[in-house]
């Protein structure tokens, strides 16, 4: 086993890999509780109960899809990179697709399933490099930052810190109410933990927020901690049962968004974590195709089980910092996700006010790369800015992407740089124009 995972070559050991895998798990364990709450639109109180996805099934699907993704990454690509349903992508699934477009969660899972199959095909061919090179780096960065702003807004809104206002659209909520104060407490605690660089700061912040909520009667006290694994029956297989529902221009945009965000989120995370671990060779990632295949395969598995798009987690960097260097650490993380399926009773503790701090803080982390955008170049700065700002303002990640991708060819052509725009970008320009003409 040491030979397979190249322990000697990488200068690692079982101890380092186990500690690294555990550290990564604790750093991203929050997704087990945030994902069900998000996909079920728990913060939207007037959403019909009959149309909500089952939280228990999503919890199990999240754990199993994460376990499968981590183990595949460890075995196929042999990288210490963990996989789980992506923050931002789950918000797009719930708030943009289900709530905003009125698409059923079953059809949305079908969209995730198809995007995963396309991702698998791209991972097996050389076309993936063409896709990566087609999208300008400024737009890639803007999409990530825009999603960060979006999920931060979702967290602020769902917790009651921001509420609706007929004159100004939004305003600050009742900051004297218990639930809002609990969220503010959670944000402060989590920020302090992150500033102090405490491993698993987001997860620990959620735990402390939940405990504070129980002390002051704002969060129900669980009757048990360990219980039976929630059934997958409500969600399992819905992705392929509802495949006939995907044949529309609206669903095409949804699938493209799932594919685009998932693809570039994964590519960026792989490079970032591999660079930190010293695994890059001549500025290239060895076995990149295998890593993308592991990631894309987990998307298909997750959709069938009943969760939104999975992706490589940048929190894997915490495991690398703790000593992880090989795929063995990812397998350790995967096994821990399997064990986590028995902790479903804790879902009752994780209210929208407990998860809101995680959304707000993770959103802030996603905005960090904005400094890499050439803001002094107006032809790329404007499309990037519009991509980013229109996501929270229109409450739609897809709309933000569409607007940015429409403006980019326009500004580049006006600047006399038409030849620098990849043909794929012109194709997307036409697709998104048709999207606004016929669907908006």
From Swiss-Prot:
It is found in: Cell membrane. InterPro entries: Azg-like, Azg-like_bact_archaea, NCS2. The chain crosses the membrane at residues 18-38, 57-77, 81-101, 107-127, 142-162, 175-195, 201-221, 251-271, 291-311, 327-347, 354-374, 388-408, 419-439. GO terms for cellular component: plasma membrane. Disruption phenotype: Cells lacking this gene show normal growth on inosine as the purine source, normal hypoxanthine-guanine phosphoribosyltransferase activity, and are resistant to azaguanine. It is a multi-pass membrane protein. Belongs to the nucleobase:cation symporter-2 (NCS2) (TC 2.A.40) family. Azg-like subfamily. Involved in the uptake of the purine bases hypoxanthine and guanine. This is Guanine/hypoxanthine permease PbuG. It comes from Bacillus subtilis (strain 168). The gene is pbuG.
């Amino acid at each position: 086993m040491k030979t397979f995972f190249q322990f000697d070559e990488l200068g690692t050991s079982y101890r380092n890999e186990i500690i690294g895998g555990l550290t990564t798990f604790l750093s991203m364990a929050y997704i087990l509780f945030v994902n069900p709450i998000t996909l079920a639109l728990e913060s939207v109180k007037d959403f019909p109960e009959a149309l909500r996805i089952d939280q228990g099934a999503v919890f199990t699907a999240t754990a199993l899809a994460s376990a499968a993704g981590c183990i595949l990454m460890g075995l196929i690509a042999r990288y210490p990179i963990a996989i789980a349903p992506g923050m931002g992508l789950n918000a797009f699934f719930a708030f943009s697709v289900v709530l905003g477009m009125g698409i059923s969660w079953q059809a949305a899972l079908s969209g995730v399933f198809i995007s995963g199959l396309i991702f698998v095909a791209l991972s097996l061919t050389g076309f993936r490099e063409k896709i990566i090179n087609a999208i300008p780096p400024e737009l890639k960065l803007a999409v990530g930052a825009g999603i960060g702003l979006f999920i931060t807004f979702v967290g602020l809104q769902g917790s009651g810190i921001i509420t609706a206002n007929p004159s100004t659209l939004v305003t600050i909520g009742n900051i004297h109410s218990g639930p809002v104060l609990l969220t503010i407490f959670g944000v402060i605690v989590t920020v302090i933990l992150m500033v102090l660089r405490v491993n698993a700061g987001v997860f620990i912040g959620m735990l402390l927020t939940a405990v504070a909520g129980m002390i002051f009667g704002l969060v129900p006290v669980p009757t048990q901690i360990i219980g039976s694994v929630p059934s997958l029956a409500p969600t399992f297989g819905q992705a392929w049962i509802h495949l006939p529902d995907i044949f529309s221009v609206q669903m095409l945009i949804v699938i493209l968004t799932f594919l685009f965000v998932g693809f570039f989120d994964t590519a960026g995370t792989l490079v970032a974590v591999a660079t930190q671990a010293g695994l890059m060779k001549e500025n290239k990632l060895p076995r990149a195709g295998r890593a993308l295949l592991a990631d894309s395969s987990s998307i298909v598995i997750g959709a069938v089980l009943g969760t939104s798009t999975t992706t490589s987690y940048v929190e894997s960097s915490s495991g690398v910092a703790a000593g992880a260097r090989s795929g063995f650490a990812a397998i350790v993380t995967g096994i821990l996700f399997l064990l986590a399926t028995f902790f479903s009773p804790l879902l009752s503790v994780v209210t929208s006010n407990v998860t809101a701090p995680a959304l707000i803080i993770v959103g802030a982390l996603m905005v960090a790369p904005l400094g890499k955008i050439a803001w002094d170049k107006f032809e790329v700065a404007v499309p990037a800015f519009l991509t980013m700002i229109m996501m929270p303002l229109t409450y739609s990640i897809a709309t933000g992407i569409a607007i940015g991708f429409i403006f980019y060819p326009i500004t580049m052509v006006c600047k006399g740089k038409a030849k620098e725009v990849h043909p794929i970008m012109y194709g997307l320009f036409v697709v998104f124009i048709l999207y606004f003409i016929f669907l908006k």
